[in-house]
Structures are given as structure tokens and as C-alpha cells.
């Protein structure tokens, strides 16, 4: 008798368990005209634990092409999560020895990383990386069936990291950015862009102070730094680029120093000194080629230090005046009227950094076709990342006079209490005089007034009077 006997070839075994399972991934097969028959997307899945897995795949073609890839997901609860993908392909199209035979190596990297905001209040890391060589999607068989991926013209990647050392007030933050144009294989990369910040501290303050505070203990300073390194190039030239000659880099420092002192118990003195330094790896010297009637640029590589500084000092005090209204006229409602006068004067100075002794500005003679000669001024550091100090000397004296008038009256809600009423919250005048200016050194006179008429309503007005309007 014909008794049906069921026969089956096991294709895969998937046990239903509560734990993660590792196992083989069966490949798919097919035929691709340029690369031949293939087995692809076969490999092994590693269920390492409930926080991390790994999938390894491979592909091979009968005409010599092959590729491997690795994909991983990770997740640590309340800490971080992300995914990573890497693929490498060695693609050979056509038959070896024939004129249309081509061989290309390409790869792709994707990385996404997210950190929980509560994981570490002092440090953070985030990443969104999507990098691929320009030929990768054209050689990837999966992309042929995904027009959106195949026609993608730009890719962007970024990684950012920051940390804070609260005990010393130091903060670091860094980013790396990459932009790709897949059509012409151009790359714009910044690696790294680092910011350093040191919060205000008092370098001369004694750890174990005894007695009154010394004047030098009131001197404070801070620091900010910025390091940047960037390049615009082609994909195949990136790994062969020279850090000094091909990359655009620099380091900028800023150090403000200040203090606050009291003179004769009534006058507040506040000096300050600001220093900025720029470090570059090259400069561009310019000259004029009279025969060709064009400017000639000569790039000189080496360490270049470009700095500038400024200083200032200010003095201010407060003068108080009181008026007790006559009770016969005003009764006992108004207790007193107070007038506070705050005069201040400040002086700021910065030298002329276009002077020849600094070397930040140069000149050359340009001989025109008609025989006339012009003197051209330029800066060898004009196109650098952090610029060049400005031209011109500064010597400025500023004056300011501020008035405040308040009235102390009995509170209608409390028979034993008093409250303050603002009559004139501020009435101020300010003007400055530039000693370095060759003409019109006096600035305009600025007057400002602020009145608080009601609890939530403030009136502000500013008027400017031109010092040389009738000159």
C-alpha cells in the first residue's frame, strides 16, 4: 500500500527560550551579471548577553568579489545605548584580463551612541556617524534595490564629548564633524574642535588665611582655549594629507586677569588685563610680480605666535544724601528721601598692533602697467582660523554719573512698618574721550532714565546728544 511518509530537511532550528540564543544565519544565493553567482548575508549571530549582541556576515561571488560586515547593538540601562555597523567590500566587475574589468575596495561605518542624561552629570558622549566611501553604495547589491540610499548625495557625521572637573573648575568639550559629497568624493572634516575652559580662580589666595585678606588675594583670572583642525580635500587624498601643509589648524588662548580693591575705604578700584594669543602653523607672505602683473603668494611653514593685549582700570564710589521732609507740611507719612550719586571713571589702553615691531602687518610695492606705484598693506595671518589683531591704538577715558532717588514711607498694611518707593530708579549720563584719536576724540553724550511707576511696569528712555553736531 502507498503509505505517505513525510520527509523534510531542517532549514533552521529556533528554540523558544527565555534567554538570548546564538546561531548560524543561512545565506541567500543568486546571480549578478557583473560579479557572477553569489552566496551572501550568511554568517553567525552571537547573543553575548542581554546588553550586547554581534552579527557577522559574509558574501562571496564566483568572479572574485567578496565582502564582510559586522553589526552590533548595545544597551546598558540608565547608562547608554547604541549600535555599530562596519562593512568592507572587495568588488571585481567583469572578467579578469578583459578591458572592462574593474577592481574597487570600499567600506562603510555607522555608529550611533546615546548617553542617558542621568548616567553621569560630569561627562557625556554622543555620536552619529554615517561614513562610506563614494563607491560603496554603487557596489553594494542591497543598495541597487533602494533608490533613496543609492541617490544620497551627502553624508554627515558628528561625535561630541564633554567633561567637567568640578573640583578645579575645568571644562573640556570636543566635537568631530565630517561632511561628504558622494558625487565628487569631496570631504570637509574638522578633527578635533576642542574647547577648554577654566573658571575664575584666585591664584594668590592663601589656603590657610590668618587675619585680614591681603590685597593680592583679590586678584582673579580665568582661561579659555580653542583648538581647531580642519581640512577640505578628496576622499582618496585624506589619508595621505600632511597635518601642517594640508590641514587648517590653530590654537587660540584668552586669559583675563582682574581685581577689585578698596582705596581709602570709599573708592572701589577695579583693574583688568586681557591677553589673547593665537598659534598658527604657517603664514602667507605676498609680493608683486611686475612682469606678470600679479600678486605672488609664498607660504612659509613653521610656528607662529600672534598675540595682543589690552588693559583697563576703573574707579567708582557712592555719595549719599538724605532729606527729612517737614512733618508740618508732609505729615508723618514720608519718613525720608534718599539720593544716591554714583560717579565712576575708567581708562582703557591697547597698543597699535599694526606697528612693524609686531610683524602682524606687512607692505609691498605694486607697480602698475602705467608705471604708477602703490603701497599695498596686508597681513600674513589674514585667512587664519582666529584672525589677526586689529589696527590702531586705543587710549580711552570714560565717565559715568548715575543717580538714584528713593523715598521711605509708612506702609498702609502695617502700622509699624515702612516700605521703599522708587522716585527715580536711575538717571545717568555717560561720555568718553579717546586720547589716541587724531580728530573728534570726544564721544556723544548719552543720557538714560529708568522709572518704576508700578510694581510690574518700568519706563526706560535713552537720549544721545552729538558732541560735534554744530562743529
Annotate each language-model stretch with its function.
Residues 1-471:
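Outer-membrane beta-barrel proteins and related beta-barrel translocases across Gram-negative bacteria
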